[in-house]
Amino acid sequence: GGAADAGALNAWLSAEREKPGSQEDRPAATALRAAIDEAHGRAPPSAGYVTGQLMRKWQNALRQGFNPNPAAPATAAAIVGFDDGLKRFSYGPPVASAQELLILIQDGLVDPRAAHDPDIVMTGTGWRLVEHDTTAEVAAMVDAVLPPPDLGRLDDPLMRGLIDSGRVTAIEKGLGARIRPDGRLIGRDGSVQPGLCLLGRLAMGSVIAADSIHDCFGAAADRWAQGVAARVRDHTG
C-alpha cells in the first residue's frame, strides 16, 4: 500500500466536503488509467480510493444510522452530498468496464471532455454540444446520469400538484421530500399527510443512498409495509 499521511488525507477530505472531485486535476484518461492501476494493485492506493472503499463497506451502517432517524436539514444535505460525491470511488465502475472505456478513449472513439449542461443543437448527423467557446459534434449520446432528486425541478403534474398544495415539501433545497421513517409524507405545515407515502430517490435527504438495491428490499421498505399494515389494522390514515 501507499505511505500513511494524515495531513494529506485531512486535506483531501476537506476538499471533498467543499467540492467533491476538486482534488483531481489530471486529464480524464490519465486519472482513469491510474484508478485501474490502483484497483489491480499495480499502484499505491490514493486517499480517494481508500476512502471510497471504506464508504462502500460502511453503506449498511450508514443506512441504519441515517434512515430511521430524522436529521437536521443542513446535516442531511452535508451527509448526502458527501456520500454522493464518494460514489465515484465506492460504487464503480467495475474495473473491466473502466478498461474498456480506456481502450475506446485511446482509439479515439470516446472523447472524455466534460460539459456542464451545454446547449444542444440537432444536426443532420447527430448533435452539436456548445458550452461557452467549446463546441463538439457527436453522433451518439448515452444518458448515463440520473437527475438530482430536486423537488424544485419536477414537472410531473401529480407531484407538482402535491408540492404546490403543500402536501409534499423538500427537506432542504435541492433534496427530496420530507418523510417519516415509515415513508409517510410530511407537509409544509409539519403534519403527516394521511394516505400519502413516498420511498426511493425523491425522498433523498430523508433517506440516503436510495438508488441501491438495499432500499428496494431493505429496512426502509419494511418500515413502510409495517406502517401500512398497522394503519389498516387500526383503521387510521
Task: Describe the residue ranges of each PLM region.
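Flavin (primarily FAD) cofactor-binding/catalytic cores of flavoenzymes
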Residues: 1-232
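Short, flexible loop/turn segments with low-complexity composition
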Residues: 234-237
